[in-house]
Amino acid sequence: MDPCSSLFSYVFMHLFVLCLQAQVTVQSPPNFTQHVREQSLVTDQLSRRLVRTYQLYSRTSGKHVQILDNKKINAMAEDGDVHAKLIVETDTFGSRVRIKGAATGFYICMNKKGKLIGKSNGKGKDCVFTEIVLENNYTALQNAKYEGWYMAFTRKGRPRKGSKTRQHQREVHFMKRLPKGHQTTEPHRRFEFLNYPFNRRSKRTRNSSASLRP
């Protein structure tokens, strides 16, 4: 066999093997979108919980959602009512939340019949709701356990069964409002001017700048 041909074959085979190894070692980049979607479906036990306090204004009743001492839930509370103050805890780093009354400590949950009920223990998936911001700037709250079922109230403020709700219905539309007298941040403070002492270098710089002026 011709030595040149043998050398060419050897080099070709060597390059071919290197190409195969490179194809095996190269991995596809991680799909971050899929990771977020999967993690949003489970309770996040590691991240720090974000806690917010606000009222839920019902579009249909014109009143606010409240959780009473007897665990009943309705949308008949006036602005600033003690039972209308809600504590909202994030369940994942997505938009899933748990809602409980600040006065009673009961969580808003949904049973298998689609009825809103109050529970002292809100760890179940039936007490988790997904916040959906709609095009009209209202927010819909879909139950995490019963997909397609929403928190809803009638014009009289009575809870409506989740099995009879749809996202486009006015009964499922809410607006977040801060309780009366609740401030998100501290009052603005006036600016304080500090007397910064000049050192030798700053004095020299100031004098040189003054000498350069016409």
Swiss-Prot record:
Coiled-coil features, chain-numbered ranges: none
GO cellular component: cytoplasm; extracellular space
Record CDD domains: beta-trefoil_FGF8
Claim: Secreted is one of the keywords in the record: yes
GO aspect biological process, one term: positive regulation of MAPK cascade
Subcellular location: Secreted
Glycosylation sites recorded in the entry for this protein: 31, 137, 207
Source domain of life: Eukaryota
Keywords: Developmental protein, Differentiation, Glycoprotein, Growth factor, Mitogen, Secreted, Signal
Function statement: Plays an important role in the regulation of embryonic development, cell proliferation, cell differentiation and cell migration. Involved in initiation, outgrowth and patterning of the limbs.
Name of protein: Fibroblast growth factor 8
Gene (name only): FGF8
